[in-house]
Amino acid sequence: MILDKVNSPEDLKRLSLEELLLLAEEIRSEIIRVTAQNGGHLASSLGAVELVLALHRVFDSPRDRILFDVGHQAYAHKLVTGRKDRFHTLRKEGGISGFTKVSESPHDAITAGHASTSLANALGMVLARDLMGEDYHVVAVIGDGALTGGMALAALNKIGELQKRMLIVLNDNEMSISENVGALNKYFKELQIRKWVQDAEKLGKNILERISPQLFGLVDRAKEAAKLLLHQENPFYAWGIRYVGPVDGHDLKGLVHILEHLKALDGPTLLHVVTKKGKGYKVAEADPIYWHGPPGFDPKKPEKVSKGYTWSQAFGDAVTELAHMEPRLFVLTPAMREGSGLVRYSLEHPERYLDVGICEDVAVTTAAGLALRGMKPIVAIYSTFLQRAYDQVIHDVAIENLPVVFAIDRAGIVGADGATHHGVFDIAYLRTVPNLQIAAPKDALELRAMLKKALEVGGPVAIRYPRDNVERAPEGVWPEIAWGKWEVLKEGTEAYILAFGKTLKYALEAAGDDPRVGVVNARFLKPLDREMLRALSRYKLLTVEDHQRMGGFGSAVLEALNEMGLKPEVQVLGLPDRFFEHGAIPSLHRQAGIDAEGIRKALAAMGVAVVHERA
């Protein structure tokens, strides 16, 4: 195999074009093989193989810096930069990351995971290069979905102003995770149509020259005028950025030729490359949304694998039903329709649904505008992505106490996506915001109750739930919930475990049938149930959460006890002050000491060693 001979990008420069083409197919096979075992971002990486090979053939990594936005498309990059022998560990605990990571390889120019960051990073690098008198190329590879992000567009504005030498490669596959939205996406499609027209014109060029040179000259002058008009329309020219394309992102020879030419140019240049997401794997080409990030599968008989009924689906079903009951309900998502469980909702209530693209800040402030005019918006968003709209939560929603509901998916440890995606900071950054209330349901039925009640409380509410399966709640059932009140699930005589969110199942498992240990579903963090907390203060208390210990639920409990002048023995379990890498969720919980075993150890340290009765 040719891949066996490739240990660094330098090895690509010694291969013939024919060998590079064979290598592309070998890389696709390896990507399919490993993602079939481990899961991962399959379709994006399959679509970028030729582009990655061309970039590493032309440029000199790691001296030249090649940045991959998000990192979904970087598997081929990992395979040709000395990590092929570890590629089988992709996304596994102790293995290589599913994204680019500076600490993993000198060829990874940035640590990625969130969208739209590559252009600002690249701008910083070219500024440093020029100030330090160095000479190397900086290439930022960004998808058409990530380019819709406000951070990317703002960076383009500055890149055009400063006119520094750099190359932007727009990898246009018409997708982010869901289908792309917005005016810029429509423009890219129009450019592709124009490219098709230009190709058709080539067919008639020689015919016109033979029939009438005069007629050909007239047509040629008209085309030059049209080109000038096109340049005036092109938004990249308006930014002061040279635009080249669109070109075929699977034409390896053509890509190498174009990149060699662009390498010699001064100033900022954008190369528009059109690729097919899932290229070379028929099922992924046909359904790039599902095969964007599938779980494990049989590569010989690839079929969609049921992930069971998830919290995301429970949320989607609940809001779809709620929208039939509440005509002012409106749901927004930042490019995560499928991931947030909103396919059904978007089909049944298209007029009250908005995908703003990869623009979390826009989602939150648009929700504020809706609320100001009497609507009841729900922002469906992952915990890790809500970080990107923190100012909007405060400035546009909370200050005016607007009735916006934040449905925070993927709260807590999320597993194989690792440090950039764990939702373990939202409690700390949200509970300090005045007016904003925070809750976490124990099951799908309680989620329905919280969503319905949240639309009635009159201010901002955050409801957080994990990446996990959950038992389906019956449709049409909307139980009442005592807002701000906790729930005792098991009485105890010596100690109580106060569990917030997902850790409740661990608390019940740890307590077992020991009569000394009680368990509380501490489902409301803000407001805390101070009445129950006061009543429980005569017992030993252990708080548990799937969140950073610092600033989390346990901290809130300690603050409340201090304010009430109560001093029970309290231990706080949560994530320590470090970033957790990728791995299986149960294993990462075990590392953090927040699983059932960790809870039992903490109880034992408090003098309450749990004893289970034998049947």
From Swiss-Prot:
SMART domains for this protein: Transket_pyr (SM00861)
Residues reported to bind Mg(2+): 144, 173
Presence of the UniProt keyword Transmembrane helix in the record: no
Transmembrane residue ranges: none
UniProt catalytic activity: D-glyceraldehyde 3-phosphate + pyruvate + H(+) = 1-deoxy-D-xylulose 5-phosphate + CO2
Enzyme class: transferase
Residues binding thiamine diphosphate, per UniProt: 72, 113-115, 145-146, 173, 281, 360
Cofactor note text: Binds 1 Mg(2+) ion per subunit.
CDD domains reported for this sequence: TPP_DXS, TPP_PYR_DXS_TK_like
GO annotation, biological process: 1-deoxy-D-xylulose 5-phosphate biosynthetic process; isopentenyl diphosphate biosynthetic process, methylerythritol 4-phosphate pathway; terpenoid biosynthetic process; thiamine biosynthetic process
Gene Ontology molecular function: 1-deoxy-D-xylulose-5-phosphate synthase activity; magnesium ion binding; thiamine pyrophosphate binding
E.C. numbers: 2.2.1.7
Record key words, sorted: Isoprene biosynthesis, Magnesium, Metal-binding, Thiamine biosynthesis, Thiamine pyrophosphate, Transferase
HAMAP family named among the record's database cross-references: DXP_synth
Family per record: Belongs to the transketolase family. DXPS subfamily.
Known role: Catalyzes the acyloin condensation reaction between C atoms 2 and 3 of pyruvate and glyceraldehyde 3-phosphate to yield 1-deoxy-D-xylulose-5-phosphate (DXP).
Oligomer and partners: Homodimer.
Protein name: 1-deoxy-D-xylulose-5-phosphate synthase
The organism of origin for this protein: Thermus thermophilus (strain ATCC BAA-163 / DSM 7039 / HB27)
Taxon lineage: Bacteria, Thermotogati, Deinococcota, Deinococci, Thermales
Gene: dxs
